[in-house]
Amino acid sequence: MTDMRAGAAAPTVSDLINSGVDYAKSAKAAIPYAVAALGAMVLPAILGPKLGGVLGFVCGVATLFVAMMAAREAITGEFGYRDSDPIAVLKLIGVCILIGIVIMIVSIPLAMLIAGGVVGIAIFSLLLLAIVVALVSRIAFLLPALAMNDPISIQSMLAQTAPYWTTLILLFVATALPNVLLSALFGGVGGFFGVLIALIGAVISVALGLVSIGAVSRLYGQRARSA
């Protein structure tokens, strides 16, 4: 694996993916993360909007807690809860809400500028995905920074011009691509196979999500924190 410490050559997408897979294979966070994340995805669909929505929200918050602990495990090798985690999760929720607001503000005029139809929808989806990936990649280090209780702000992350930002964008594209292709190929399938494909997509999302957390957190711990 390529050395990702400060002063070493900027890692490639392959390096990051290998690093994330290496973490995910032995992560103590793997099972609790999978249970919480899958619960957040499937419970609303199985139990309905009321009970399922409440339990899905609880699982979503639990996912953020486990993601925080997973990021810390990827950096330190230790998996466990810290007293600083609740405040860190609240900050993370706030950032997620902020990202959602930004995406909503951007998507409305973008949708108005693009013609309708299948081609228009495809172009809109790709542009919106590009905006989301670019934004998330710029603040990717927020999760591991909060996990380690390091001082960091969105402004400081957006101001950074480190050589691996492009690599982070490509990492998120690579980990999102399987589900994008799955939706494109089987999005209109209904019935049992539709449910099966949705479950497969959820499992893929969880697995690649853990890989991404491991890759970004290790990059942050080995390079960004010592830069």
Residue spans for each PLM region:
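Short, small/hydrophobic-residue-rich motifs at membrane-helix boundaries and re-entrant hairpins
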Residues: 2-3, 26-79, 95-107, 176-179
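Interfacial transmembrane-helix boundary/kink motif in multi-pass membrane proteins
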Residues: 16-27, 77-101, 155-159
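Alpha-helical transmembrane segments
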Residues: 48-63, 120-133, 201, 205
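Membrane-helix interface and helix-disruption motif detector
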Residues: 46-57, 112-120, 189-195
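Nonpolar helix-loop interface/hinge motif
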Residues: 1-45, 49, 129-194
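Hydrophobic alpha-helical transmembrane segments
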Residues: 30-34, 57, 93-94, 122-123, ...
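Juxtamembrane transition segments at transmembrane-helix termini in multipass membrane proteins
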Residues: 2-4, 58-80, 138-149, 167-227
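Hydrophobic, well-structured mid-protein blocks that either form specific transmembrane helices
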Residues: 83-127
